[in-house]
Curated annotation (Swiss-Prot):
This is tRNA dimethylallyltransferase. The keyword Magnesium applies. Keywords: ATP-binding, Magnesium, Nucleotide-binding, Transferase, tRNA processing. Residues 37-40, 162-166 are annotated as: Interaction with substrate tRNA. Its cofactor is Mg(2+). The keyword Ribonucleoprotein does not apply. It comes from Acinetobacter baylyi (strain ATCC 33305 / BD413 / ADP1). Belongs to the IPP transferase family. It catalyses: adenosine(37) in tRNA + dimethylallyl diphosphate = N(6)-dimethylallyladenosine(37) in tRNA + diphosphate. The record marks T103, R126 as: Interaction with substrate tRNA. Its EC number is 2.5.1.75. The gene is miaA. One of its GO terms (molecular function) is ATP binding. ATP binds at G12, P13, T14, A15, S16, G17, K18, T19. One of its GO terms (biological process) is tRNA modification.
Length: 314
């Protein structure tokens, strides 16, 4: 099938100004916004995700925000399914979808497709792997992965718990390494779309300033109180995907400690800042490798980006 349906992908590292640009474009009335963010999907996780306020979402509605609780799991495959359905619905209205966010795995899965024959998640197998980790430690689980799938073992770290679980899960269900299956299996790519990729890549020094400002605001408006409320409401633990989100992981570790001294709090804030910078670095690297992409230095040429997108799709 020929590519006929335009889709705008508005990408960028955390704190790069993606949402502001997307909202400015939305005001023209010919677009709908689809969030591409693995943290914004969670209800009640607002401050640490820099989620648009209820008032902002009323003015600039986003699909795929607040769709599950922090106890639930949401995969890249589910994102592709949900996003493609929304893209088709938006086109049926005569509008153009703008996918805006910084979760590069979601963008990669949409652009390149997913392996179609990998087994679905199995709750019993996953529970058995997590029980093994609880009893023997994650190093033991990682060592098992390295034995059955050396390629995955070389790629993953012991801290990559969800990726380790998925790789071992696939092996136990199929008897084959996940890396072998991924290399052999056909991809399901939505060829009916024409993707127009735009990446906001600000100067790194300026981006680091924006990240520091965002985190300072996060702490000052009650982020720790938010995480405390989440713990009480949902009985959260650090094995949940929601609690591996940058900021939440560090805050959860701090709040579960017996010693919440000033020094430990400062250490927690430093760890969150470092993790956020590392996330931005990974996002930056992936975006630079993406072909057929228009790049903008956010703080110097955002008007150029707005004008270019308006002229093309407004």
């Amino acid at each position: 099938m020929s590519s006929t349906l335009p889709v705008i992908n508005l990408m960028g590292p955390t704190a790069s100004g993606k949402t502001a640009l997307a909202c400015e474009l939305y005001e023209r009335g010919h677009f709908e916004l689809i969030s591409v963010d693995s943290a914004l999907i969670y209800k009640d996780m607002d401050i640490g995700t820099a989620k648009p306020t209820k008032e902002e979402l009323a003015l600039y509605p986003h699909h795929l925000i607040d769709i599950i609780t922090p106890l639930e799991v949401y995969s890249a495959a589910q994102f592709v399914e949900d996003a493609t359905q929304l893209i088709d619905q938006i086109h049926m209205k005569g509008k153009t979808p703008i996918l805006v966010g910084g979760t590069m795995l979601y963008f990669k899965s949409l652009l390149e497709g997913l392996s179609t024959n990998l087994p679905s998640a199995d709750a019993e197998v996953r529970a058995a792997i997590e029980k093994q980790a609880e009893q023997e430690g994650w190093q033991s689980v990682y060592d098992e992965l390295a034995r059955v799938d050396p390629v995955a073992g070389a790629r993953f770290k012991v801290s990559d718990r969800q990726r380790i679980i998925r790789a071992i899960e696939v092996y136990r269900l199929t008897g084959q390494p996940i890396t072998k299956l991924q290399a052999e299996q056909p991809k399901n790519v939505p060829y009916r779309y024409t993707f127009h990729n735009y990446a906001l890549l600000p100067d790194r020094i300026e981006l680091h300033k924006r990240i520091e400002q965002r985190l300072f605001k996060m702490w000052s408006i009650g982020f720790l109180n938010e995480v405390e409320s989440l713990i009480k409401k949902y009985d959260l633990n650090d094995n949940l995907p929601s609690m591996r989100s940058v900021g939440y992981r560090q805050a959860l570790d701090f709040l579960l400690k017996s010693d919440m001294s000033h020094n430990n709090r400062r250490e927690m804030e430093d760890k969150a800042l470092f993790a956020t910078r590392q996330l931005a670095k990974r996002q930056y690297t992936w975006l630079r490798s993406l072909q057929e992409t228009h790049y903008f230095k956010t703080y110097l040429t955002i008007k150029q980006a707005q004008e270019d997108l308006r002229n093309s799709y407004g």
